[in-house]
C-alpha cells in the first residue's frame, strides 16, 4: 500500500500535478519515499525547479539532507540546475552547504562549474567554502576561470578564494583562463595578484598558453604584469617560438617589444627565426630580422633559416634573409647548400637571388654534384643559363662528380642539348647539327639501311651528289655513325665453355705443373697443377653465370665475361687462321649474317700527288682492319693466307697431314721431353730415356729448321705493317712508275679484301670496307679521270663500298675534257662514264625532302586510274610495313636506337618486302618492251635506287606502290632530261588532274623539247627516245601526275639542277624571241585561244612560242645550235657558264583585266588540258578589257569612251547601282548584296581604300560573284589612279597621254594600222604595276599554294646553291676570285655569241639598225611581269588569283602633273628595239636636275639609294629571295614620247637651265654611275649565278634617299615597241652613225671599254665590290632598285616634243615580230606597266619639260610633299 502511495507521490511530482499531490499528501504523511535511483520527491522537484511542489513537500515534512545513490542532495541538484529560489528555500530549511557528492563536489562547485552566478552568490552569502577542492584538487575558481565565468571568479575572489591555487598538475586559474583566452577572468585574476610565471601542466605558463591559443588581448594583459617571457614549455619552446610558428604576428611584435630573446633554440635546435621561416610567415621573419635574429644558426639537420626559406620556395623570404648577409655556403647534413636546394627545386627566382648574393656555383653535395650537374640533369635551360652567366663558372662544366659525370657529358648524353641553346652551336659537326639543320637525317638513315642490308652484295659505289660547297661532306660522318649503329657493332659476346677452353686450361696447368716438377719436386708440380685447374674452373663458372645476371652487383662479372670471351675468341681466330681453311659463307637469303663496317679516315683526295693520297687512304683502311681484327690476326694473315690450291677441305695440310696434328705432335714431344727431364734428369745410366730425349730433340729441331722460312715471314709480317709497306712503295714512286705503284696498291687492296673475307668466314660476320672519297671536285680537272679509274680498278672487287661525295657537274665536265677520242667518238660521255661507275646515285636535295611530309598520301591506290586493279599481296604488305621513320628511330636516344630486338624486327620486315619487291621488279622489268636496253648493271642500279627511295618514302609516312615506284625510278634514271621537262611542267602549271597520265603531259610538251644534241647537249644523258615513249605508254603501271607528286620529294637519283638548266635555257630562248630577233621560233601548235589561268606558267611575256594568232602552227622551224644558249663551243654542256635568270621567271603570272573581260573568262580552277606549249604561251586577254561596255568596235577604230567615273565620287546608292551593272552576278543575291553595302556604309571612298580581304569578309559573296565584284573594284581603283582631272594641262592634253590601263578601244581609235590588220591580231597585255608589288606580303600571310601543294620547288635557287637555302652565304664565301672571273668571261662569251646569232641573215632589222640592248636587257627585263605574276601567285588564296588584293591607290596630290618625258623612249622607226647611243645617254642626265635642292653628297648617292618611292608598301618587310637580283626588270613596252623639236637638242644636256651651284654636279654623278654600271653589266650574271645576293632592296631606307630615287626613276624610262608607221621619225644616233654592221652596234653591250648606254640604265641592279657602300643584307617584299633595270632611258631633252606628235605615237604601241616561220607580221599591243608609268608620271610633273629653274624646284618639292602625304595616308 505504501509503495503504491509513494509511487503516486513521485509520479505526481514528476508530472507536476500539484492538486493531486496536495490531495495525496493530505492523506499520506510519508513524503520521503524514494524511487529506484534513491531520489526523494524533494530531490526530483528541486531538480525540476518547481518551487510550489518543493514548498508543499517541505511543509509536509520532507527531509532536505537526504541523499540519493550518488550522494546528491536536493541542494546540489538545485544548485547545478541554477534554481535560485529553490536553493533559497532549502537554505531556509537549514540544508548542509558543504555536503559533497560522489565526486567530492559541493553545491558551490557545481554552481561554479555550471556558471550559475546567482546561486554562487547566494551560497557564498550563506557561508559556503570557496576553497573546497574536488577530484584532482580542482578548486571552484579553477573551474570558473577555465570555463570563462568571469563574474563567478570575481565573487569567489571577493569571498576569499585562493588566486594562485592550483590543481593536481600545478595549473592555476590564470593558466586555465589564459588557455581559452577568457580575458575578463584573466583581468580579475591578475587584479587579485595572480602569479603570471607559475607553470602548469607541461611547464606551460599563462603567457605560453595564451600565445599558443593566439589570444592577443590576454597576452597583452599578462605582459602588463611583466612576466618572464623567456620561459619555455617542455619542448623548449618559448612564447615567441610558439607565436612565430603559429604565425601570430601581433603577439610576436608584443613579445619582441617585451624583450623576448630571439635566438633561443628549441630542443631540436631550431631557432625562432627558423620556426617562422618554416611556417612561411613573412612579416614575422621581418620582425625577427629587425630584432637581429641570428640567421646563420643551424637548426635541425644543419638547416639554416635561409635553407628553409629556399626549401619552402618563398622568394620573398629569401630576399629578406639575403639582405641580412647570411652565409650562403652552410651545408646541410646531406651537403646541400641553399643554391643546390634551389636548383633541385627548379626555382629560377630563388637561384637568381642567391647568385646575386654571391652563392658559389662550385658547391657540391654528398654525391659530388654541383648545381650545374643538377640543372643539366633536370634539363632546365634557364637554370643552366643562370648558373653559367659568370664565364668563370664555365669550368664547372668539366668538373666530375663522384660518379665521374661532368655536366657537359650529362648534356651530351641527351638528344637535345641545353648547352648548345645557351652558348650556340659549340662546333659545326654532323653530330652537332643532328642532321636536321641540313635536312640529311633521312638520307643518312636510308643509305645506312641499304648499305647494312645483309643481302646487299658488295662491291657497290654510292654517289653522294650535291653542288660544290653545299656541305655534303657533313653527311659523311653522320652516314658513318648511322652505318655503325645499323650494323650493331656495339654488341659484346659473353664467355662460353668450349673445347678450346679445356685444351688451353689443361695446357696451362700442365705447363705450370711441369715447371714446379722440374724445379722443385714432381709431387708439388702435380698438386699445384690440379689445384690451379680446379680454381680456374670455379672462376669460369662464377663468370659464366654472373655475367648473365642483372643488377649492378654483378657488373664486374659481366665485364670479365666480355673481356674473357673477346680474348678467347681472338685466340681461336688466330688458331683458325693457322690451321683451318675458311669455310664458305652461307647464302644471305637463308641466314643473314651481322654486318660490320670499316672506314677510311683519310678520305680527301688531294690534287697534289693523287697516288700518295690513295696510298694513305688504303693505309688508314688497313689501320681500321688492325683495330677491328687485331694486330696479330691482320699481320699473320699475310703469312698464313689460304692459297686457292688448298681446295675446300676443312683443315690446312702439310705433307698430307692436317697441320694442327703436326703442331700437336711437336707440342707433345716438347712436353714429353720436359717431363722426362723432370723425372729422370740427365743421367748416363738411363740409356732408354736418353735415347727417347735425343729422338724428341731431333724431331723438334727438324720441325724448327723446316719452318725457318715461315718464322722469317712471321717476323717480317709482324714488324712491317701494311701501312709501312704502302709508304715504302710511295717513297719509291719514281722508281716504280705509276703502273708499278698501282700494282702494289692493287695487291695490298686484294690482300685486305681476302683477309676480311677469311676472317668473316671464321667469325660468321660480313665485313664491308667503306672507302669514302671526298674532294674530287677540288682536284685538278685533268687528274679527275685518272683518279676515278684508279678507284674503280682498286675497289671493284671484294667487300668494298666506295662513296663518292662530289659535285657531279664538275666531275662530268672534267671527264668530258679528258675522255679519249675513241670514247668520245663512240658517243660515250661523262654522264655515261659516271653512270657506269656509280651503282647508287643520291642527289642531295634537302629542301625537297624536308617538304616531303607535306605530301603525306593516305590513299591505297596511289594514283592508279580508278578502273585499274592494282591491289594485291604486295600492296597489303606495303600497308603492313611499319611506318616508323628511320630518322625518328635514331632520335629516340641510345636505348631505343640500340635496341637490337626492335631494330632487327623492323629491318627484317623491310627486307622481306625488299626481297619480294626485287623479285616482282625483275619480273616486271623483263616483261616490258623497253627492257631491251637494260643491262644487269643497270638493273642493279635501279634496284638500289628503288630501295633507297622506298625507305625515304616510308620514313616520311608516304604510302606508295612498289611497281609504280620502280617505273618512276626507271623513268628518271634512263631519261632524266625529258623527265625533268615533265616535272618542270607539273611544277609550273596548276590545275592538272592527279589522274592525268605522263604520256598525255609529254604529248603536250614534246614539241617544245629540243630533239637534237646540237641544240641541247643534255639530250645525250637520256636513253633512246623511242623507248621513252614506249615506256610512258606501257600498260602496267601507267604513271600519272599524282605519282610525280608522291615520288618527287624523295627521288634521289634525279639531278635537281637539270630543271634549273632547262628553265634557264628556255628563258633565254623566249627573251630572244620577245625582241623580235631572227631567232627561229620553237614549233607551235594550233589551238583555240586559251583562257588565262591563274596558275598557268608563261615564262615570257610575248614568246614566239606562244602566239596563237597568225603563226602557221604546224610549221616546225629549225632550232639553233646549242651554242646559242651556252657560252661554250663544242658539245660540252655549260653547267655553270650559262645565263642566270631570276627565279621569278619560272613561276606563273596572272594578268588582271577589266570586269567585263572576266565575264567571258572561264573559272580559274578549270582543269582544261593545256595546249602543247608547256606553259610557254602568253595568256591571251580579250579586247574588251576597258571600263566601258564591250563593243565590237573595241578592237578597231571607234569613238573614245566618255570620262571615267571616279571611284571616290560614288555614294552608297551609286555603289549599289554599279553592282547591279556587273554582268554575270547572281541576280537572286543582288538584294542581299545591296543590303550589306547599305548596312556597312560601303561607299566609293571605302572601296578605294579598304583592304580587299576585309571587304570579302564583309560582303560574304559566293565565289563567282566575289571574283567579278573584286575585279570591278580593282579596275576602278586602277582607272582612278590614272586620272588627275584637276591639272589643267592634263585636261588639255588628255587625248595625247598614254591610255589608262585596260582601255584598248581608246588606243585603237588612233591606230595607224589598217583596221583589218589590227582586228585580226590578238592584243597581249602585261598588266603590271608597282603598287601590285608593293602590297604583296602586306595583306596576305604565308604564300599559299592551294592546289599543287607539292610544288615545293617552283622557285629555283641560283645555279650554285641548289642544295642549301637561297640565303646560303657559306658557299658564296668559298667562291674564289678565279671562279668569279671564269663566270665573267663565260658571260662575255655568251652575250657575244647571242649577239652574233641575233645579227644573222634572218634578223629583221628594218631600218638597218638593231638594238644593242635587245640581247641582254630583254634577257633581263622581259620578266618584268613575271615579278608581279610570281608574287601574285603566292598571294593566291583558295585557288583564286588576286591581282590587286588590298592594294591602295598610289595617286599623288592632285596638284601633281604627269611628265611624259619619264614614260619612255619613243621608237619611231620600224626596228623593234632602237639602239640607244652615247648621246641618248647624255640626255639622261636631265634626271639629275630633279635634285636641285639636294646636297651634292645626296645627289651622288645615285647608286646607293634604294627604291622607296614606288609606294608605301615598300616600307614593309619583304621575304628574302634571289628575286631581288634582277631588279624590277620592267618590260620594255611602256610608251615613250618624243618630239621632233627636241631632236635638235639631243645630247645637249646643259641646255636646260639649272641653278649655277649645281651645274656640274649631275654630270659627275652620272659619269660615276657609268663607271659603276660598266662592271655591273657583266658582273650582274656572275653575282646572280654564284648566289651573291643583290643589295638593292635594303629595308633600311632614309627619306633623303627617296628624292634621289626619284631622279633614278625619271631616268628609268621604259621602251614601247612601235610599228612601221613610225619608222621615219628618228634618225640613226650620232654615236653609231658610222657603224654599218648592226652586229657591231649590238656587240657594244659586251664591251668593257666602251660602255653601252643601256648599261647606265641598269640602276643598282647588281652590286659589286666596287660599288659605293650599299652592301647590305636585304629582303624582298618590294620591288628592287630602280624602275629601269633594262628599259633604256628616255632623255628629258628628247621628251621636249610637241604634244601633237605625241598623240600620234600614243595611239597604239605595237611590236612587229617576223619569225621565220610566220608568213604574216604579228602586232602585239603591249600595255606592260601602264599603271606604273602613270603613277611615275604623276610624280614627275610637266614642269620638268620647262626650261625654267623655278619650275624645276617646284616639281621636286611638290613631288616630295605628295609622297609624304601619300605615305601618311596609307600607313
UniProtKB/Swiss-Prot annotation:
CC terms in the record's Gene Ontology section: cytosol; late endosome; membrane; protein-containing complex
Name under which the protein is recorded: Kinase D-interacting substrate of 220 kDa
Domain notes: The transmembrane domain mediates interaction with NTRK1.
Pathological association: Spastic paraplegia, intellectual disability, nystagmus, and obesity: An autosomal dominant syndrome characterized by rapid growth in infancy, obesity, global developmental delay, intellectual disability, spastic paraplegia, ocular defects, and dysmorphic facial features. Ventriculomegaly and arthrogryposis: An autosomal recessive disorder with fatal outcome, characterized by prenatal onset of severe features including limb contractures, arthrogryposis, and enlarged brain ventricles that may be associated with hydrocephalus, abnormalities of the corpus callosum, and cerebellar hypoplasia. Some affected fetuses may also have congenital heart disease and hydrops fetalis. Death occurs in utero.
Residues in KAP NTPase domain copies: 440-953
Positions in the Extracellular compartment: 521-524, 681-685
Bias kind Basic and acidic residues: ranges: 1431-1457, 1537-1561
The keyword Phosphoprotein appears for this protein: yes
Tagged with keyword Transmembrane: yes
ANK repeat start and end residues: 4-33, 37-66, 70-99, 103-132, 136-165, 169-198, 202-231, 235-264, 268-297, 301-330, 334-363, 367-396
Role, per record: Promotes a prolonged MAP-kinase signaling by neurotrophins through activation of a Rap1-dependent mechanism. Provides a docking site for the CRKL-C3G complex, resulting in Rap1-dependent sustained ERK activation. May play an important role in regulating postsynaptic signal transduction through the syntrophin-mediated localization of receptor tyrosine kinases such as EPHA4. In cooperation with SNTA1 can enhance EPHA4-induced JAK/STAT activation. Plays a role in nerve growth factor (NGF)-induced recruitment of RAPGEF2 to late endosomes and neurite outgrowth.
Localization (cell): Membrane; Late endosome
Organism (species): Homo sapiens
Amino acid at each position: 500500500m505504501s509503495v503504491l502511495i509513494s509511487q503516486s507521490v513521485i509520479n505526481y511530482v514528476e508530472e507536476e500535478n500539484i492538486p493531486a499531490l496536495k490531495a495525496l499528501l493530505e492523506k499520506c504523511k510519508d513524503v520521503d519515499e524514494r524511487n529506484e535511483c534513491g531520489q526523494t520527491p524533494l530531490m526530483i522537484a528541486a531538480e525540476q525547479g518547481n518551487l510550489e511542489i518543493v514548498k508543499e513537500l517541505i511543509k509536509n515534512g520532507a527531509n532536505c539532507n537526504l541523499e540519493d545513490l550518488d550522494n546528491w542532495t536536493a541542494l546540489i541538484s538545485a544548485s547545478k540546475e541554477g534554481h535560485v529560489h529553490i536553493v533559497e528555500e532549502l537554505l531556509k530549511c537549514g540544508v548542509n552547504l558543504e555536503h559533497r557528492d560522489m565526486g567530492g563536489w559541493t553545491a558551490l562547485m557545481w554552481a561554479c562549474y555550471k556558471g550559475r552566478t546567482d546561486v554562487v552568490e547566494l551560497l557564498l552569502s550563506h557561508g559556503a567554502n570557496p576553497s573546497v577542492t574536488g577530484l584532482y584538487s580542482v578548486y571552484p575558481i579553477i573551474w570558473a576561470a577555465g570555463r570563462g565565468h568571469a563574474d563567478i571568479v570575481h565573487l569567489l575572489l571577493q569571498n576569499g578564494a585562493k588566486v594562485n591555487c592550483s590543481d593536481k598538475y600545478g595549473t592555476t586559474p590564470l593558466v586555465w583562463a589564459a588557455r581559452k583566452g577568457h580575458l575578463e577572468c584573466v583581468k580579475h585574476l591578475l587584479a587579485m595578484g595572480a602569479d603570471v610565471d607559475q607553470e602548469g601542466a607541461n611547464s606551460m605558463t599563462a603567457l605560453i598558453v595564451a600565445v599558443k591559443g593566439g589570444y592577443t588581448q590576454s597576452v597583452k594583459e599578462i605582459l602588463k604584469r611583466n612576466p618572464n617571457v623567456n620561459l619555455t614549455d617542455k619542448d623548449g619552446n618559448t612564447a615567441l617560438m610558439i607565436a612565430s610558428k603559429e604565425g601570430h604576428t601581433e603577439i610576436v611584435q608584443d613579445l619582441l617589444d617585451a624583450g623576448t630573446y630571439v635566438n633561443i633554440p628549441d630542443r631540436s635546435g631550431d631557432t625562432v627565426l627558423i620556426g617562422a621561416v618554416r611556417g612561411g610567415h613573412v612579416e614575422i621573419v621581418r620582425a625577427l630580422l629587425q630584432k637581429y635574429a641570428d640567421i646563420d644558426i643551424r637548426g635541425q639537420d644543419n638547416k639554416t633559416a635561409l635553407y628553409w626559406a629556399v626549401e619552402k620556395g618563398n622568394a620573398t623570404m629569401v630576399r629578406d634573409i639575403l639582405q641580412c648577409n647570411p652565409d650562403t655556403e652552410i651545408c646541410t647534413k646531406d651537403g646541400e647548400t641553399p643554391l643546390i636546394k634551389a636548383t633541385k627545386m627548379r626555382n629560377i627566382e630563388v637561384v637568381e637571388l642567391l647568385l646575386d648574393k654571391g652563392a658559389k656555383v662550385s658547391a657540391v653535395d654528398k654525391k659530388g654534384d654541383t648545381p650545374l650537374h643538377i640543372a643539366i640533369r633536370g634539363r632546365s635551360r634557364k637554370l643552366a643559363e643562370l648558373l653559367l652567366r659568370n664565364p668563370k663558372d664555365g669550368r664547372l662544366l668539366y668538373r666530375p662528380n663522384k660518379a665521374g659525370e661532368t655536366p657537359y657529358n650529362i648534356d651530351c648524353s641527351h638528344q637535345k642539348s641545353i648547352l648548345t641553346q645557351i652558348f650556340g652551336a659549340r662546333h659545326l659537326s654532323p653530330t652537332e647539327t643532328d642532321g636536321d639543320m641540313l635536312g640529311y637525317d633521312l638520307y643518312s638513315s636510308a643509305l645506312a639501311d641499304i648499305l647494312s642490308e645483309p643481302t646487299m652484295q658488295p662491291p657497290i659505289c654510292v654517289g653522294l651528289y650535291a653542288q660544290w660547297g653545299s656541305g655534303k661532306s657533313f653527311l659523311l660522318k653522320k652516314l658513318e655513325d648511322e652505318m655503325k649503329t645499323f650494323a650493331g657493332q656495339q654488341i659484346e659476346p659473353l664467355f662460353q665453355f668450349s673445347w678450346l677452353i679445356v685444351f688451353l686450361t689443361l695446357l696451362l696447368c700442365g705447363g705450370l705443373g711441369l715447371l714446379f716438377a722440374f724445379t722443385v719436386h714432381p709431387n708439388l708440380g702435380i698438386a699445384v697443377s690440379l689445384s690451379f685447374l680446379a680454381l680456374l674452373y670455379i672462376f669460369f663458372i662464377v663468370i659464366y653465370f654472373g655475367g648473365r645476371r642483372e643488377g649492378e652487383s654483378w657488373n664486374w662479372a659481366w665485364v670479365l665475361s666480355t673481356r674473357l670471351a673477346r680474348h678467347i675468341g681472338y685466340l681461336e681466330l688466330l688458331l683458325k687462321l693457322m690451321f683451318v681453311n675458311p669455310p664458305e659463307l652461307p647464302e644471305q637469303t637463308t641466314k643473314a649474317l651481322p654486318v660490320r663496317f670499316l672506314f677510311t679516315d683519310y678520305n680527301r683526295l688531294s690534287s697534289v700527288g693523287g697516288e700518295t693520297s690513295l696510298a694513305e687512304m688504303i693505309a688508314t683502311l688497313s689501320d681500321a682492319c688492325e683495330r677491328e681484327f687485331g694486330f696479330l690476326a691482320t699481320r699473320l694473315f699475310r703469312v698464313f693466307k689460304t692459297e686457292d690450291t688448298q681446295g675446300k677441305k676443312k683443315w690446312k695440310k702439310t705433307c698430307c697431314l692436317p697441320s694442327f696434328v703436326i703442331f700437336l705432335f711437336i707440342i707433345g714431344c716438347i712436353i714429353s721431353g720436359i717431363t722426362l727431364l723432370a723425372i729422370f734428369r740427365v743421367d748416363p745410366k738411363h740409356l732408354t730415356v736418353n735415347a727417347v730425349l735425343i729422338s724428341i730433340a731431333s724431331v723438334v729441331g727438324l720441325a724448327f729448321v723446316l719452318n725457318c722460312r715461315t718464322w722469317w715471314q712471321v717476323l717480317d709480317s709482324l714488324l712491317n705493317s701494311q701501312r709501312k709497306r704502302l709508304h715504302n712503295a710511295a717513297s719509291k714512286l719514281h722508281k716504280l712508275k705509276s703502273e708499278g705503284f698501282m700494282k702494289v696498291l692493287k695487291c695490298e687492296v686484294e690482300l685486305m679484301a681476302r683477309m676480311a673475307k677469311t676472317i668473316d668466314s671464321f667469325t660468321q660476320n660480313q665485313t664491308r670496307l667503306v672507302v669514302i672519297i671526298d674532294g674530287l671536285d677540288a682536284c685538278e680537272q685533268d687528274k679527275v679521270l685518272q683518279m676515278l679509274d684508279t678507284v674503280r680498278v682498286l675497289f671493284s672487287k671484294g667487300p668494298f663500298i666506295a662513296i663518292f661525295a662530289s659535285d657531279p657537274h664538275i666531275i662530268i665536265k672534267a671527264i668530258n675534257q679528258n675522255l679519249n677520242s675513241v670514247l668520245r667518238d663512240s658517243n660515250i660521255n661523262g654522264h655515261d662514264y659516271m653512270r657506269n661507275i656509280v651503282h647508287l646515285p643520291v642527289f642531295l636535295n634537302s629542301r625537297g625532302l624536308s617538304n616531303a611530309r607535306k605530301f603525306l598520301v593516305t590513299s591505297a591506290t596511289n594514283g592508279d586510274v580508278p578502273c585499274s586493279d592494282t591491289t594485291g599481296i604486295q600492296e597489303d604488305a606495303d600497308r603492313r610495313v611499319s611506318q616508323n621513320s628511320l630518322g625518328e628511330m635514331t632520335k629516340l636516344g641510345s636505348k631505343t636506337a640500340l635496341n637490337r630486338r626492335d631494330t632487327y624486327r623492323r629491318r627484317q620486315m623491310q627486307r622481306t618486302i625488299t626481297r619480294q619487291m626485287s623479285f616482282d621488279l625483275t619480273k616486271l622489268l623483263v616483261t616490258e618492251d623497253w627492257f631491251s636496253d637494260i643491262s644487269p648493271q643497270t638493273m642493279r642500279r635501279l634496284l638500289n635506287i628503288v630501295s633507297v627511295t622506298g625507305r625515304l618514302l616510308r620514313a616520311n609516312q608516304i604510302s606508295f606502290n612498289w611497281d609504280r615506284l620502280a617505273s618512276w625510278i626507271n623513268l628518271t634514271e634512263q631519261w632524266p632530261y625529258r623527265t625533268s621537262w615533265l616535272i618542270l611542267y607539273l611544277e609550273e602549271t596548276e590545275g592538272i588532274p592527279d589522274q592525268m597520265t605522263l604520256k598525255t603531259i609529254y604529248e603536250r610538251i614534246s614539241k617544245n623539247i629540243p630533239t637534237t644534241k646540237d641544240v641541247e647537249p643534255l639530250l645525250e644523258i637520256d636513253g633512246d627516245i623511242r623507248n621513252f615513249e614506249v615506256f610512258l605508254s606501257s600498260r602496267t603501271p601507267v604513271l600519272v601526275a599524282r605519282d610525280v607528286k608522291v615520288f618527287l620529294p624523295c627521288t634521289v637519283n634525279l639531278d635537281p639542277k637539270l630543271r634549273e638548266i632547262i628553265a634557264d635555257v628556255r628563258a633565254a630562248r623566249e627573251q630572244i624571241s620577245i625582241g623580235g630577233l631572227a631567232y627561229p621560233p620553237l614549233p607551235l601548235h594550233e589551238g583555240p585561244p586559251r583562257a588565262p589561268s591563274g596558275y598557268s606558267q608563261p615564262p615570257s611575256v610575248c614568246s614566239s612560242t606562244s602566239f596563237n594568232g597568225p603563226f602557221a602552227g604546224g610549221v616546225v622551224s629549225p632550232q639553233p645550235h646549242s651554242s646559242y644558249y651556252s657560252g661554250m663551243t663544242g658539245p660540252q654542256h655549260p653547267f655553270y657558264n650559262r645565263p642566270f635568270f631570276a627565279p621569278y621567271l619560272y613561276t606563273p603570272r596572272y594578268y588582271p583585266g577589266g570586269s567585263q573581260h572576266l565575264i567571258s573568262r572561264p573559272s580559274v580552277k578549270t582543269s582544261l588540258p593545256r595546249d602543247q606549249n608547256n606553259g610557254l604561251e602568253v595568256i591571251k586577254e580579250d579586247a574588251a578589257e576597258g571600263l566601258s561596255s564591250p563593243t565590237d568596235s573595241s578592237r578597231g577604230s571607234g569613238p573614245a569612251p566618255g570620262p571615267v567615273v571616279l571611284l571616290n565620287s560614288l555614294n552608297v546608292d551609286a555603289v549599289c547601282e554599279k553592282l547591279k551593272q556587273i554582268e554575270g552576278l547572281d541576280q537572286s543575291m543582288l538584294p542581299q548584296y545591296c543590303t550589306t553595302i547599305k548596312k556597312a556604309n560601303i561607299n566609293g571612298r571605302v572601296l578605294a581604300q579598304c583592304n580587299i580581304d576585309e571587304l570579302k569578309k564583309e560582303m560574304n559573296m559566293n565565289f563567282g560573284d566575289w571574283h567579278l565584284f573584286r575585279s570591278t573594284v580593282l579596275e576602278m581603283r586602277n582607272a582612278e589612279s590614272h586620272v588627275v582631272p584637276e591639272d589643267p594641262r592634263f585636261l588639255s592634253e588628255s587625248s595625247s597621254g598614254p591610255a589608262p590601263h585596260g582601255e584598248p578601244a581608246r588606243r585603237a581609235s588612233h591606230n595607224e594600222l589598217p583596221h583589218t590588220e589590227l582586228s585580226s591580231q590578238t592584243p597581249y597585255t602585261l598588266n603590271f604595276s608597282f603598287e601590285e608589288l608593293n602590297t604583296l606580303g602586306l595583306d596576305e600571310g604565308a604564300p599559299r599554294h592551294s592546289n599543287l601543294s607539292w610544288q615545293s620547288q617552283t622557285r629555283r635557287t641560283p645555279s650554285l646553291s641548289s642544295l642549301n637555302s637561297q640565303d646560303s652565304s657559306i658557299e658564296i664565301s668559298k667562291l674564289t676570285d678565279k671562279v668569279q672571273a671564269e663566270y665573267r668571261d663565260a658571260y662575255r662569251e655568251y652575250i657575244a655569241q647571242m649577239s652574233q646569232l641575233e645579227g644573222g641573215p634572218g634578223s629583221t632589222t628594218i631600218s638597218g639598225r638593231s638594238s644593242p640592248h635587245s640581247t641582254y636587257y630583254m634577257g633581263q627585263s622581259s620578266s618584268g611581269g613575271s615579278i608581279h605574276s610570281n608574287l601574285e601567285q603566292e598571294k593566291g588564296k583558295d585557288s583564286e588569283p588576286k591581282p590587286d588584293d588590298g592594294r591602295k591607290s598610289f595617286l599623288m596630290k592632285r596638284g601633281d602633273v604627269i611628265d611624259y618625258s619619264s614614260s619612255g623612249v619613243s621608237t619611231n622607226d620600224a626596228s623593234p628595239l632602237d639602239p640607244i647611243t652615247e648621246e641618248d645617254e647624255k640626255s639622261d642626265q636631265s634626271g639629275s636636275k630633279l635634285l636641285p635642292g639636294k646636297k651634292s653628297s645626296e645627289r651622288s648617292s645615285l647608286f646607293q639609294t634604294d627604291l622607296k618611292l614606288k609606294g608605301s608598301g615598300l616600307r614593309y618587310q619583304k621575304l628574302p629571295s634571289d628575286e631581288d637580283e634582277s631588279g624590277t626588270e620592267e618590260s620594255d613596252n611602256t610608251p615613250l614620247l618624243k618630239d621632233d623639236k627636241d631632236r635638235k637638242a639631243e645630247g645637249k644636256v646643259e641646255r636646260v637651265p639649272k641653278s649655277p651651284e649645281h651645274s656640274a654636279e649631275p654630270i659627275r654623278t652620272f659619269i660615276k654611275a657609268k663607271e659603276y654600271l660598266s662592271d655591273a653589266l657583266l658582273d650582274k650574271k656572275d653575282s646572280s649565278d654564284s648566289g651573291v645576293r643583290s643589295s638593292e632592296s635594303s629595308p633600311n631606307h632614309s627619306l633623303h634617299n627617296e628624292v634621289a630615287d626619284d631622279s633614278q626613276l625619271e631616268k628609268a624610262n621604259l621602251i614601247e615597241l612601235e610599228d612601221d608607221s613610225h619608222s621615219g621619225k628618228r634618225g640613226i644616233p650620232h654615236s653609231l652613225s658610222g657603224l654599218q654592221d648592226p652586229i657591231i652596234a649590238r656587240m657594244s653591250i659586251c664591251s668593257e671599254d666602251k660602255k653601252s648606254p643601256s648599261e647606265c640604265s641598269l640602276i643598282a641592279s647588281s652590286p659589286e665590290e666596287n660599288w659605293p657602300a650599299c652592301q647590305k643584307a636585304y629582303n624582298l617584299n618590294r620591288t628592287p632598285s630602280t624602275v629601269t633595270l633594262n628599259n633604256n632611258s628616255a632623255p628629258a631633252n628628247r621628251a621636249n616634243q610637241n604634244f601633237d606628235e605625241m598623240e600620234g605615237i600614243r595611239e597604239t604601241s605595237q611590236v612587229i615580230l617576223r619569225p621565220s616561220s610566220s608568213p604574216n607580221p604579228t602586232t602585239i599591243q603591249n600595255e606592260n606597266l601602264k599603271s606604273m608609268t602613270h603613277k611615275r608620271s604623276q610624280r614627275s610633273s610637266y614642269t620638268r619639260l620647262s626650261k625654267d629653274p623655278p619650275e624645276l624646284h617646284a616639281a621636286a618639292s611638290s613631288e616630295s610633299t605628295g609622297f609624304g602625304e601619300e605615305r601618311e595616308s596609307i600607313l
